Regions:
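Histidine-centered catalytic/metal-binding microenvironments
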Residues: 1-42, 173-277, 547-659, 938-939, ...
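Short beta-strands within extracellular/lumenal beta-sheet-rich domains
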Residues: 61-81
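Beta-strand-rich ligand-recognition modules
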Residues: 102-164
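The substrate-binding groove and active-site-proximal loops of carbohydrate-active enzymes
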Residues: 124, 230-239, 269-285, 308-317, ...
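Catalytic grooves of carbohydrate-active enzymes
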Residues: 203-233, 270, 274, 408, ...
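Catalytic alpha-helical scaffold of carbohydrate-active enzymes acting on polysaccharides/glycoconjugates
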Residues: 249-264, 288-300, 316-374, 388-396, ...
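C-terminal (or distal) subdomains of carbohydrate-active enzymes
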Residues: 390-396, 409, 418, 434, ...
Length: 1014
């Protein structure tokens, strides 16, 4: 017999789409619909239900961009519906859904008339099974339906991910016209056997598409599908579905092979805390998703769902307390699993060390206190690369495991492992898994399962991987169709063997199976999204400033509490921290969200700054009294201008050398006795002479403090990406409009395009340091502004500050891994050097850098450090970065790594001038005598006990020994984890009263808790 497999497959697909799918509902019944449009921002159910609803016709338009319409659906279930076990009564809703991804368009949430949330309706989850809810729209067993649907008219900002500029990301420019038409709001009588038949078709057709064309198993499946289609009557699918299913049952009953890859399927919904929607919409997305999950758990007791981000649970508790209690019950039963340990799924490249610590402190404390769960994993599937400081921080918070899949997005290199141990800068290792399915939004279809098995790098050693399944990014979560797929692939020949699982079960099993995996040392650099280090500079500046204000506020508040007995503002500090932690979400701090999000972030940072300045002012008054004497407070970990670290005084040291600025024919000469700098008439630095080392720092013929403008047109992902080809087009900004001496500094102004730059250049007193303040009125589009410092230093690597230390990165391009790091991230400083000489470049708000090698007349290698100051991407915010910006940069010559550390703190924590009583000083609450041991935080304990908590780290990459002294009465000193729980000492050698001797490994992070004497 002539048999054409491809024709059979086409026949099966058409039969499924044209006959089976339409037959899943035997019949439908209309409902009466009325509607009320919310005038402005969303309201809660009680306000909506009390409003005046107007009759609404199915087919009519609704929903201005970002608007909300409440629909009220009433009616009765027809007699005889749902009378047998093969049918179910459902509410079926189509809000005008498009082909866009769920979570990127209209969404709805269904309530009973009493205000109980039932579940969400979304493009691929449109039905509400009324029969599964006690009183789900009915009361006292009646057949009446009375339901409300809160419909969100969220615009599809992403479109087809074509990255075109759009006004939809700003509520003020998004327009007023309706976006959607209500296509369907009615009752449907679900034919359960037909629906099950549809799931059989999906499983088997998907499987055969993944099998080799010449495989026996594929041929068997094709024949069985062909027979099933023959056996069913296309005019009576309901009546013949059982026959078709009986034929397909034999294909589905063939068990998986003993060597089949084992998939731990974990329900999940990646919900971006903001991205192409504002934070306020995320709050509703969380409620919609979590209600879906609770509904699914009620009907599938084996289903396990994992959700990260304590912030999202906190929103649920605040705005949807009844739903939060339902989630709490599911957590107690083990079906709903909090994961991730963090307040949000944070970026990990740019947050400072203490901020990353607080992500874990805030997240883990919430999960422990509210849900009784001590989370043990770091769950960051979508962040844009992972700092080498993260393993130590995670382990210090009690985390054992780490999961991401984002490195699968690498443009150049493929990570060699999926299961391994990841080692951080201090040597801490954490068991790590990259799901080889390469997505956190799996549908558990055959294509995803086959990809997981095909790409799994540990074949022959390991046998298992984790697959997160459920609609995500904009939420939604798993569906009943996905659970049906899991059921059919539990043991199915030709497919990996799927089991519903949890992250904990997977990691325990993977560790047991693979106790000695390979080790990856250092950062997990993402070869993609490099522009995220620079986009939305105001958001990044707000983050950096907030982090350092928080340090100051906690330090001075703790000092005032201990010394002056004032109340510690724990509540205000917690609010400030939680606000900052939210802004560190991996689409906010990286600058990759819509305009609405970044405008809101700026307002949040301003509010945080106001609150923290008030705390600092109140603390200073308590410590210094009310007077007119200027007092300088130094929150930095090392002395500045004679002001002690973590202390204050009204007397600063007098500069020992003269600081001169003279105009010459060729330009200007600045000299402070440490450095002599020559600047030409164009405002470019032509010479920096280190007088102590008798060494020239600027290569012959080069110019430092050179602003360079690049065309910045990435191939895709505008705000996210800087592509390597940007380097091919560059304009050196050398035209100067104004250059003059004023206030012992050189001031210069340049104009280019529609923009203007004003710089102030000066030498620091008594230090070989140049300070440059750059103010930009930025009105470019798709341009990248960099600030270049060519240096006469021979280096093959550069040190960049990260959390609690620094990493060395090659600056040559010997390998594809080296070449791919053409843009890197640093915190407060970078350092390049030879064995006995170096230069540090520090900043107060910049993260993106590129550091390259050059040559002087082809003979000697030089090094160029460039800071990425500003970008101007067009998507998702077409006005990103437009307006005013200020950046401070310093260049210290003859710098060691310790010098770089001090310089980074100096630039970010300048001396603070306050007023107090003459002669008043603020003695440091804590002192440390080891130069390499840096105090990162001084605060009171989270538990309200009044204990003083001090966080320290070794900053130079060396072994360090030093004494930490509490300058107040102490009963005991203990070493704790990051959650301030006592642990066995790893660094404490001995304690003598208030003094503790520490021995630290390179980059070791330590938390000490001082119990105060009454």
């Amino acid at each position: 017999m002539l048999y054409n497999s491809s024709l059979v497959e086409a026949r099966v697909r058409r039969f499924r789409s044209e006959r089976v799918v339409p037959a899943t509902y035997r019949t439908t019944s209309p409902l009466a619909v009325s509607a009320w449009e919310v005038p402005d921002e969303p309201v809660m159910f009680a306000d909506a239900a009390a409003s005046r609803f107007q009759p609404f016709q199915v087919g009519a338009p609704w929903g201005r961009p970002w608007g909300t319409v409440w629909f009220h659906a009433t009616g009765a279930v027809p007699d005889g519906w749902g009378a047998d076990s093969d049918t179910g009564v459902e509410l079926v809703v189509d809000l005008g859904f498009t082909h866009a991804q769920p979570g990127f368009q209209a969404e709805g949430m269904v309530y009973t008339a009493s205000g109980r949330i039932l579940k969400a309706v979304e493009p691929l989850n449109r039905a509400l099974p009324l029969s599964f809810h006690s009183g789900g729209g009915a009361s006292d067993g009646a057949r009446l339906v009375d339901l409300y649907i809160e419909a969100a008219a969220n615009p599809n900002v992403a479109q087809e991910m074509d990255f075109f500029p759009t006004p939809l990301g700003d509520k003020t420019t998004a327009g007023e016209g309706p976006l959607y038409r209500l296509r369907r709001l009615e009752l449907g009588l679900l034919d359960i056997p037909v629906w099950q038949l549809e799931q059989d078709f999906v499983a088997l057709v998907g499987l055969l598409e993944q099998l080799p064309a010449d495989s026996q198993r594929r041929a068997e499946i094709v024949h069985m599908l062909d027979r099933a289609v023959d056996a069913m009557d296309p005019e009576d699918i309901a009546g013949t579905a059982a026959v078709g299913r009986s034929i397909l049952a034999s294909a589905l009953a063939r068990p998986a092979s003993a060597s089949a890859h084992r998939v731990h399927a974990v329900g999940h919904a990646h919900i971006d805390s903001a991205w192409l929607w504002p934070v306020r919409e995320t709050v509703r997305k969380v409620a919609r998703t979590f209600s879906n999950v609770c509904d699914l758990i009620d009907r599938n007791p084996d289903f396990v769902f994992a959700a990260s981000s304590a912030q999202q649970y906190a929103w649920l508790k605040e705005f949807y307390p009844d739903l939060f209690e339902r989630v709490r019950d599911k957590v107690a039963s083990g079906n709903f699993v909090p994961v991730g340990s963090m307040w949000v799924e944070s970026d990990t490249n740019m947050p400072g060390g203490e901020a990353l610590v607080r992500q874990f402190v805030a997240g883990k404390r919430f999960f422990l206190e509210e849900l009784g769960v001590d989370t043990q994993e770091v769950w960051l599937p979508d962040s844009f690369g992972y700092s080498a400081g993260l393993p130590q921080i995670a382990a210090g918070a009690g985390a054992r495991w780490f999961l991401t899949q984002k490195t699968s997005w690498n443009e150049t290199n493929v990570m060699p492992h999926h299961t391994f141990r990841w080692e951080g800068i201090d040597g801490t290792q954490i068991f790590t898994h990259f799901p080889p399915v390469d997505t956190y939004n799996s549908d558990l279809g055959a294509a995803d399962l086959a990809r997981a098995e095909r790409q799994y790098a540990e074949k022959g050693i390991g046998t298992m991987s984790l697959v997160p399944f459920g609609h995500g990014d904009g939420g939604g979560g798993p569906t009943r169709e996905m659970l049906a797929a899991a059921e059919r692939t539990r043991s199915l020949e030709g497919s990996p063997a799927v089991s519903l699982s949890s992250p904990h079960r997977f990691f325990k099993a993977a560790e047991a199976e693979y106790p000695h995996p390979p080790v990856w040392s250092g950062e997990l650099y993402l070869e993609f999204h490099r522009g995220a280090y620079t986009s939305q500079a105001r958001t990044k500046r707000g983050n950096r400033r907030s982090e350092h204000l928080l340090r100051e506020a906690e330090l001075w508040a703790a000092t005032a509490t201990v010394r002056a007995g004032v109340d510690y503002p724990a509540g205000a500090l917690q609010d400030a921290w939680r606000t900052v932690l939210l802004q560190q979400f991996h689409d906010i701090l990286p600058g990759t969200s819509i305009a609405w999000v970044h405008q809101e972030a700026e307002r949040n940072y301003a509010r945080v700054a106001e609150s923290l300045e008030q705390i600092i002012d109140t603390s200073a008054r308590a410590l210094l009294g009310r007077g007119d004497r200027k007092v300088l407070l130094n929150a930095a970990p090392s002395a500045q201008d004679g002001i002690p670290a973590l202390g204050g005084s009204d007397t600063r040291s007098t500069p020992t050398g003269a600081n001169s600025l003279r105009e010459r024919d060729a330009g200007f000469v600045l000299d402070n006795g440490k450095v002599r700098m020559s600047i030409d008439r164009a405002g470019l630095i032509r010479s920096i002479r280190d007088l102590g080392a008798d060494r020239e720092v600027v290569p012959h013929g080069a110019a430092a403090n050179l602003l360079q403008l690049h065309r910045d047109t990435p191939t895709q992902w505008d705000a996210w990406d800087i592509d390597e080809h940007y380097r091919r087009t560059v304009t050196d900004l050398t035209d100067v409009e104004i250059i003059e001496i004023a206030d012992d500094a050189l001031h210069l102004t340049r104009r280019f395009g529609a923009s203007r730059v004003t710089q102030t250049v000066r030498l620091a007193d008594d230090a070989p340091t140049i300070d440059i303040r750059t103010e930009v009125e930025w009105h470019e589009r798709q341009k990248l502004l960099k600030l270049a410092f060519p240096l006469d230093v021979h280096a093959d690597r550069a040190a960049s500050e990260i959390q609690f230390g620094h990493v060395y990165r090659p600056i040559h391009t010997n390998t594809s891994w080296d070449a791919a790091r053409f843009e890197t991230v640093a915190h407060r400083w970078v350092h390049v050097g030879e064995s006995n000489y170096g230069v540090a470049v520090a900043n107060d708000s910049t993260y993106g850098h590129d550091i390259t090698r050059g040559h002087t007349q082809g003979r000697a290698s030089t090094t160029t450090v460039r800071l990425s100051l500003l970008r101007a991407p067009l998507f998702p915010d077409p006005r990103a970065d437009q307006g005013s910006h200020t950046m401070n940069v310093s260049l210290r010559v003859g710098a060691t790594i310790p010098d770089a550390v001090r310089e980074g703190y100096r630039v970010n924590l300048p001396l603070r001038t306050v007023r107090g009583v003459e002669g008043t000083e603020v003695g440091p609450l804590i002192t440390v005598d080891g130069q390499a041991i840096v105090i990162e935080a001084v605060k009171l304990a989270e538990d309200g006990s009044g204990d003083v908590v001090v966080r320290l780290y070794e900053a130079h990459g060396t072994r360090a020994r030093g004494r930490v002294t509490a300058n107040f009465g102490v009963l005991a000193v203990t070493e704790t984890d990051l959650l301030e729980r006592e642990v066995s000492p790893t660094s404490m050698q001995n304690t003598d009263g208030p003094t503790t001797t520490l021995e630290l490994r390179p980059f070791q992070l330590v938390t000490l808790r001082f119990t105060r004497a009454e």
